[in-house]
Amino acid sequence: MKLGRGQHLGYCTNIHPGETWAQVGASLQAHVPLIRARVCPGQPFGIGLRLSAQAAQTLAEPAQLAEFRQFLRAHDLYVFTLNGFPYGTFHGATVKEAVYRPDWRTPERLRYSNTLADLLAQLLPGEAGLQGSVSTVPGAFKADIATAADIEAMRRNLVSHAGHLVALGRESGRHITLALEPEPCCFLETIAEAVDFFGQHVFGAASVAELAAHAGLGPAAAAAALRDHLGLCL
């Protein structure tokens, strides 16, 4: 819901189990309108939508997306942020380190994140100044990162995703940011680790050059775009 001064408070749907889009949709219909009626009756109600890779692929189908957008309009709901952290099963199973896989070394994580951004661009209201965000894993589970090549693979995929977000912004007019979420026992666990990874790798010269070539930007614009589209959530 809108708090004023451009701030939004959302109801995070990852509290409810649901791995398929059918399960997620049923949960939304059962719970969210009732919660909105109690929390902010007569006002728009923001949702932080959690989608697994499987659910995201289903929602990306035009008929499914059109039906969901109609549901949002009918109940005065809007989506401005997505939880793209758990790729697969999140409820009803022992997740532990498996929740971080596939991680940012892999094409699967990149494709999943691109799909989420595409969906959010179609769901995000056209309100002036409203930007979308997608949360994601903090790179990888720390024990899985053993070599410089692992770090380089994460860097390259994050830069590729930034290029996707730049292109998406040009096409849709929607600004979306990917937010890595530091957690214990992960590659990004502390502020110092995050500052080092972003400063030395994500925002480094190689990343600027890659994004400039990928997105047709000058070096200064590419450096700014990396900072505009890649960050942290705490």
Briefly describe each language-model feature range:
Residues M1-G132, A153-G163, R227-L230:
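N-terminal pre-domain/capping segments
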Residues A93-R227:
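Active-site acidic/histidine proton-transfer and metal-coordination neighborhood
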